[in-house]
Amino acid sequence: MKYSLGIDTSNYKTSIALTNIDGDIVYDKRILLNVDKGKRGLRQQEALFQHINNLPILFDDMFRNFDACDIACVSVSDKPRNISGSYMPAFLAGVSQANVLASSLKCPLYRFSHQDGHVRAASRFTELSDSKHYVSLHFSGGTTEVLLYEDGELSIIGGTKDISFGQLLDRIGTELGLIFPCGEELDNIAYDCLTQSNLSKEINLPKIKSKSGYINLSGIESAVF
């Protein structure tokens, strides 16, 4: 059995995965980067250092269960988005490891943006999996964008003009004393509020206005704080 290896070293997770020739995920492991309580993120050199330490741990585990000779190709995220100037040093950890593996195994190396991974992962298990034309919403820690996917290419057609939804949630979460990044803990709190009415409290937030496909979220941030 041959496998495709995927590597991603984004700002807050070190991730590797294997898929078989049918596209089924047969291995998927990740390590969340450590952020001290009260902080709103990591400096790039801190993230890079943690990725460099995490990758050997993940690969040691993977190669205990799979033979390196069965890897047919290596894919890696090398930048945040497919736009000019998009760059983060954190991705260098994954790119460096991917280059070494592909060269050692004499197999192809494919580079993608982190955003490509978000969009394709979301469409993979839907009726859009084989579609060549669709609109995707990308909500992450640093990005809130409306994207048009056409024939393998992404173009931005909308989004936020100021902060992203991820930044808004993380700022609220750290103010509440949660560990950054705060999305998962906030999800759990929101679920508890839905199931236990005594925990919920209504907050009147300003309406979000859209202009030519773009919005601003700073008004919500001001209302919350």
Model-derived features: where do they sit?
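Short, well-ordered amphipathic alpha-helical segments that serve as non-catalytic structural scaffolds
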Residues: 31, 50-66
